[in-house]
Amino acid sequence: MREQNSAITMNRRETLRLSLVAALTGTSAIPGKIQAMQDSDMKAISLPELPPKPSGDVAAKLFPGFEQTEVRTSGASIRVLYKGAGPPVLLLHGYPETHVTWHKVAPRLAERFSVYVPDLRGYGDSSRPADGDRHLNYSFRAMALDQIETMRHFGHEQFLVGAHDRGARVAHRLCLDFPKSVKKVCLMDIAPTLTMYRQTNQEFATKYMWWFFLIQAAPLPEHLIGLDPQYYLEYNLSVLNKTPGALTPEAVSEYRRCFCCTSTIHATCEDFRASVDIGLKMDEADDRAGNKIVAPVHALWGARGTIGPLWDVLATWRAKATSTVTGRSLDCGHFLQEERPEETLEELQRFFGTV
């Protein structure tokens, strides 16, 4: 039985690989092979709609002393962990992770700051709203409003922001839509979304293939990822992480718990669809209006990742900001806060320290 299950798993992974090739290249010969495999043993995989309930032990271990609650915003229910006293700091995660990505940094940061670590809508244990017209409910604007309302729930009209990957794109929108709320912003391992799409080349499209796969119309990406979501998730993490062992088993287990369900797979696809549809329209409108970030910006990126080698990161953000833009690379891949937590903590403390 174990050998049979292993063979089925391998067939599912081969089907996922072939399906991706067919979807991204328009190849017509491959689907016949896929269909043959599906007819033999590729029965529909039964995935839960929502993530299983989290274990309190995991939260206590990864975020000792943090409290957690759900904040009802005007468009979603946001799960957030919080701890500390001092200037408020909002930490935002990216794809395909959750707030857990901050587990090596947030507890130490909470020694000096009031730290808030939410799951973005559609991710982790936050809710999954309906898509909305042109994927509006998963736009960075909708996600930014969640964060404003979450911080106001805790009594904060102004705050500091540290954000990674998709969360950093939410932070960019937060700075544009609510300029008086963000005192400083640290943007990690991204260049501006509009800049990246406009300057896409073969190397970027190859290394960040999910940027172009996930924007395809439903249910294509959802179906293909759903064939083996654990493999897809762990492949994504492995190609972006350049520091062996940096992603702890406890963290990966949480990413797996939250990602491997139908609602998360769909919601995270909607995130990418929104960014390339209505999100780019919003960015273009800001460019035309001269709407730029007014808060001081500190950019960090992985020297062994994709963004730094392909873009002049500081130059891209100076083009989008009116205040000072500082930053540097760290010797790692994409997941700075997990691969280089001590340096990331030092950068955040230094940047946020003079408010």
Predicted segment positions?
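N-terminal secretory signal peptides
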Residues: 1-10
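N-terminal export leaders
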Residues: 12-20, 24
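Signal peptide processing junction and immediate N-terminal pro/mature segment
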Residues: 31-39
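Flexible "cap/lid" subdomain of the alpha/beta-hydrolase fold that forms the substrate-access gate
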Residues: 39-69, 75-80, 85-88, 116, ...
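Active-site glycine-rich loops that stabilize anionic/oxyanionic intermediates
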Residues: 86, 94-97
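Serine-hydrolase catalytic-loop signature spanning alpha/beta hydrolases and amidase-signature enzymes
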Residues: 96-104, 115
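Active-site machinery of serine-nucleophile hydrolases
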Residues: 110-120
